Amino acid sequence: MYTSQDSSDFFSPVSFTVISVCLLLLFAVLSLFAPSPDIENDFIRSRLDDSDQHQSAFHVPASGGAYRHDLWNSTNSKLFSACSNAGVNFAKADSKTHPDRYLLIATSGGLNQQRTGIIDAVVAAYILNATLVIPELDHTSFWKDSSNFSELFDADWFIRFLRNDIRVIKQLPNMGEKFVNPHTVRVPRKCTPKCYEGRVLPLLVKKRAVRLTKFDYRLSNMLDDDLQKLRCRVNYHALKFTDSIQEMGKLLVERMRMKSKHFIALHLRFEPDMLAFSGCYYGGGEKERKELGEIRKRWKSLHASNPDKVRRHGRCPLTPEEVGLMLRALGFGIDTHLYVASGEIYGGEETLEPLRALFPNFHSKETLATKEELAPFMSFSSRMAALDYIVCDDSDVFVTNNNGNMAKILAGRRRYFGHKPTIRPNGKKLNPLFMKKDNMTWEEFASKVRTFQVGFMGEPNELRPGSGEFHENPTSCICQKSGSEVKTGGFSSPQNQTHEVDNKVENRTEKQPAEEDREWSELDYDLDIRKQVELKGTKIDSLPILLGTDQAEVQVFFSD
């Protein structure tokens, strides 16, 4: 049995020396197989670099790259021309206008919604063989603009340009000793020519003067080519803004041109109402859900929202950041100048900041003009919208994150006047892509964006003739040069050939979209476009819904 003394003898100096020598030999042998400190540090550094590279794989470049031959022009635009002149068999106003029929209309909504009503009013007057009284504009809805027709448009030019098509007068004339009070009626939406002949014509014959109220989308989208061409003559030629609006609009364009040879105009809709209506979710947590949920309650006809489903269907408006990423992927670099036409942005400057970072050359009418220059227009929402309309129309590239009236009308106008590039986001493809972007490289993302946007860039023949709203796709008024062949990623069937004249009336039926496929501009808004005026000191936002479902008219709130 060992004693404490035995233990101390065991750990003698000689024993320690032997153990130390063995340990040194062991470390020496191990060092032959171990990597040097430099190699180990390099390995660790490499692992860290790989981790950083993975985290920063989605690195947005400042340069747009050279993905397209020419970002600022459409490929086949020279192969097409506008062709909206009346055909040889189109009856002229002098021979068909009945001397005792007067049509009056009251438009509805904002500038561009009212524009569609004015265009269709001319066609309705032609169908009814009636004299059109200069349209009455909407002064009571959300936009609260008191402008009359002649304060927005050149009334004399309007009357003069259309003199061969219909007779237009500025006011209802005195018809004998008794003052004629127009009979007021509202026609159904998408009313066909036969509908007008059946519903309105008997009233005109009996009452002599008929006033059609809330006149927006009250005429069928599908008409024979002669009537569609009349629509084009009104929209693209007869409706001219007043000199003061045109001069200010052109001044804004000139100031953009002074900053850059080319520029993009972006019509950005990201207001709280639009987002609430869409049923989309943008990552703002409970605060966003509560705020937008309260606004959404204003529409009685809307079902409970399913944000994931809405996004999968491509129904969510792109955020300002997503618009910026799309443009960069399409080839527009950080030096591109951007004119932004927008209303209130949900989230304010914080929401706009990513777009500004991508495109710091960020302009608006408020930054291009002085307060004094804008003063004559500031109190009139339609006149301010008209300024944006002019700049967007004259831009080299027009981009929109929505499919409202202004976007549709400008898309059609740009097709008519030379197929100027017009970028409409392919939401059904882009929305899922944006959700996955953090799991891919920028190169992969940009390549997919360019692929998905084929057919959404404003090239000729992207849309099938007759598809969509006519104001967006005026194929009856655009002719392809005889014998020319279009090579495009869109729909490639040739449009009207210039050597062919076909006024055949097609027996077409308009397809009514399912609710989930309807545009923001087509669903019921039970507060009659909210009418956000103050009634006896109380904002309409705080009022209960007043209209029953049997009274509610489809109002286009999200279109301008």
Question: In which residue ranges do the predicted regions lie?
Answer:
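N-terminal targeting/anchoring "stem" of glycan-biosynthesis enzymes
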Residues: 1-560
